[in-house]
Design a protein with these regions (language model features):
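Conserved active-site regions of diverse hydrolases
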Residues: 1-293
Length: 293
C-alpha cells in the first residue's frame, strides 16, 4: 500500500528515507536548506546529525540544529506552503493534517550528552530523572508540532545504544557485546514513550501519535556489532579511520562505523516500522495504518 502522502521528517536518524519510499515517495525529500518552490508540498527533511531533544546535545561537535530549531524551520515552511496555496489557510491546514511526520530523537541525548560526563553536566543526573527530563521537553516540542497543524506523527523509540560498537569499545560489555547499564538507562526513556503517546492523543483532538518500538526490532545485536570499517580511537572516536577501506560485504554488517547502521539495518528498521511484524513493534499502530488514519 502506497499512501503517497507528504512526508515531513524531524529527526536525528537517517533510515527514515526508506519509510518515505514505502509511503510512495519516488525520491529523497529535500533538506530544509535546499527546499524551494512547490517541492515542499511533498515533504521536507529537517534532520541534523548529532542533534537531540535538548538544545545543548551535540554542541561539542560544532553547529547542530536541535529539535527546537527544526520546529522553527518547519514553521517557516508552513508559511511557504500557505503562499503556494494562494494564501488559503484552510487548504494549508488540510494539507498539514494529511502529512506524515517522523520524529526520531533521543539517541544523541545519550550518545552526545548523557554518556559524556567530561562535557555535559547531565551525566550527574540519575537515569530515571534524566529520562523524565527528556520526556518533559519532548512533550512540549511534540505539542508545538501539533499546534502547527501536524496530526499524524510517528515517534521512533531508541535502539539498544549499549550495543553499538563504540559503546562496547569504550566500556565493559557483557558476553553479548553490550553495555547493560547503558541499555537500562535508555530503556527508562523508551518506557515513557507509550504513556507519552496516550497522553498526547488524549489531550489533542484529532491527533494520531504512534510509537515505533525500535528496540523490539533487534533485541540482541551485540554479537553482530562489529563495524564495517576500522574505527578511530582518538579524535573523532567511533568514526571510520580516514582513508581506511570499508568491508567488502556491507550488506552483512549491521553497523558501518562505531555509531551508524548500514543500509541493511535501515531497511530492516523501515520495513518493521511501516508494517509491524509483532504487536510489540508499534503502539497503537504501525505507519501503514497511521497513513490511513
Amino acid at each position: 500500500m502506497y499512501s503517497k502522502l507528504p512526508f515531513y521528517r524531524l529527526a536525528e536518524l537517517t533510515g527514515t528515507y526508506f519509510t518515505g519510499e514505502l509511503l510512495g515517495l519516488r525520491d529523497f525529500i529535500p533538506p530544509f536548506a535546499a527546499s524551494e518552490g512547490r517541492n515542499i508540498m511533498d515533504g521536507v527533511n529537517y534532520a541534523s546529525g548529532g542533534c537531540g531533544i535538548l538544545p545543548e546535545t551535540g554542541r561539542h561537535q560544532g553547529e547542530v540544529i536541535s529539535f527546537d530549531q527544526q520546529l522553527i524551520n518547519h514553521n517557516r515552511t508552513i508559511s511557504r506552503v500557505t503562499a503556494a496555496l494562494s494564501g488559503d489557510k484552510k487548504k494549508t491546514a488540510d494539507h498539514l493534517n494529511k502529512c506524515i511526520y517522523i520524529a526520531g530523537f533521543g539517541s544523541n541525548d545519550y550518545i552526545n550528552n548523557y554518556l559524556m560526563p567530561n562535557l555535559y553536566p547531565n551525566s550527574k543526573i540519575p537515569p530515571d530523572q534524566y529520562a523524565q527530563k527528556l520526556i518533559n521537553k519532548y512533550t512540549q516540542q511534540l505539542s508545538t508540532l501539533y499546534n502547527y497543524g501536524a496530526r499524524k506523527i510517528a515517534i521512533f523509540g531508541l535502539g539498544p545504544i549499549g550495543c553499538i560498537p563504540q559503546e562496547a569499545l569504550s566500556s565493559r560489555p557483557n558476553l553479548l557485546g553490550c553495555v547493560e547499564n547503558t541499555n537500562k538507562a535508555v530503556q527508562q526513556f523508551n518506557n515513557r514513550l507509550k504513556p507519552l503517546v496516550d497522553d498526547l492523543n488524549a489531550k489533542h483532538p484529532g491527533a494520531h501519535f504512534t510509537y515505533i518500538n525500535v528496540s523490539n526490532f533487534a533485541p540482541v545485536i551485540g554479537v553482530l556489532n562489529k563495524p564495517c570499517c576500522k574505527i578511530s580511537e582518538g579524535a573523532g572516536a567511533g568514526q571510520c579511520v580516514p582513508n581506511s577501506a570499508p568491508c567488502p560485504f556491507r550488506s552483512f554488517k549491521p553497523f558501518f562505523d562505531g555509531f551508524h547502521p548500514t543500509e541493511t539495518g535501515h531497511i530492516l528498521l523501515a520495513g518493521r516500522a511501516y508494517v509491524s511484524a509483532s504487536p510489540a513493534d508499534a503502539y497503537p499502530y504501525d505507519i501503514r495504518h497511521l497513513a490511513s488514519a
